Amino acid sequence: MATNYDRYVERMRKIADIGHSIAVLNWDKETYLPKKSANMRSQQIATLSGIMHEEFTNPKFGNLLKRLNKQRNLDDDKKKNVTVTLNDYHKATKFTKRFVMQKSMAVSKCFQAWLQAREANDFRLYQKSLEELVKIKRIEAKKLGSAAEHLYDNLLDQYEPGLTVAKSDKIFNGMKKPLKKLINKINKKKAPKKNFLYKKYDKDAQWNLGIYILNEIGYDFDRGRQDISTHPFTTSFSANDVRLTTRIDE
């Protein structure tokens, strides 16, 4: 007989499958997607993002998480999984499906505008989309709660739980003095030769260097691959499918 935790795992696997499907579409968007397919791809990603949000914020799933959170017979690992998921659930329920899809579309639109602006070396092509995305992120930060000292705290917490603007300021302010000393020390040294940075290097040689380095560090090409993208990144669709991209610059 399935336990409540088994039901939790089953639900999370379904949600993860949708998330990994979105990741595949995003990977393709940044590697092989034809230019004229961008709008439809943005819609596809937004649709799946909305479905994933619905699955995750389903009240029945929320009730299951609350019951599990009160169980005392869970081991530490399972308890931690439930605690983190319940925290994410509370955050996710602050947003509507419509908002999630709107944000997804804005991110995709902003990315496409960035590609055009980068190619044309013209920030104006990117500015409007970026401003729209910043507005949406401000709304997101406000919806996440007003308890934070700084509005950006709510967004920082998504990537580094517990980090705040005050804490990050303390970290960076503490780095200023030693960094200034290091820079002064470097400036007193003889400048190294850097003409090699501006030479022309064969495309295939650059590509093969990446493959060589990946082999040297033990990267398993049966569980991943290297491709080219405008902005290099790493993504994963499962433990057996972790992909990375590189950029070639002659």
Label the predicted regions.
Residues 1-163:
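A well-structured
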Residues 103-250:
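Contiguous, non-catalytic segments that form substrate-binding/exosite surfaces or channel walls
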